[in-house]
A protein has these predicted regions:
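Single conserved hydrophobic/aromatic residue that forms the stacking wall/gate
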Residues: 1-13
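Bacterial extracytoplasmic/cell-wall-associated proteins, especially those involved in peptidoglycan
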Residues: 10, 14-120
Length: 120
């Protein structure tokens, strides 16, 4: 996937990606945080998903912290430093996985395992 800088360049974008990273990978290793951010930007670049960070994150049924309200809470207070740094790096072009999906690893899906997640 080719990430277009015009799609991801704003401060709001960084804060939004950082909040999702904290919600989905707050207790994961830093590589896991980078991978979650990579999935978001890979989706933005894919024709199968909305073409904006906000569109991808708020797409119905995709990220459970959005549905539960946890994402809104983290976004309002600001993500932790590690998640914010990971978001900055991913937006800057450090895409660490070429995947569109991830989930908690229960051993049933083949993919790249990082921490407690599998990326596929």
């Amino acid at each position: 996937y080719e990430i277009m800088p015009s799609l991801v360049g704003s401060e709001m974008c960084k804060e939004t990606v950082a909040a999702l990273i904290e919600c989905e990978a707050g207790g994961e290793p830093y590589e896991g945080k980078l991978a979650v951010g990579s999935v978001v930007l890979n989706r933005v670049a894919s024709s199968h998903f909305p073409n904006s960070v906000v569109g991808v994150i708020y797409q119905s049924g995709q990220f459970s912290p959005v549905a539960s309200g946890r994402f809104a809470t983290v976004l309002a207070r600001g993500a932790d430093a590690s998640s914010t740094q990971a978001a900055q790096e991913v937006i800057g072009g450090r895409i660490t996985v070429k995947c569109l999906y991830f989930r908690r690893n229960n051993g049933t899906i083949q993919g790249t395992v990082i921490g407690n997640h599998v990326f596929y």
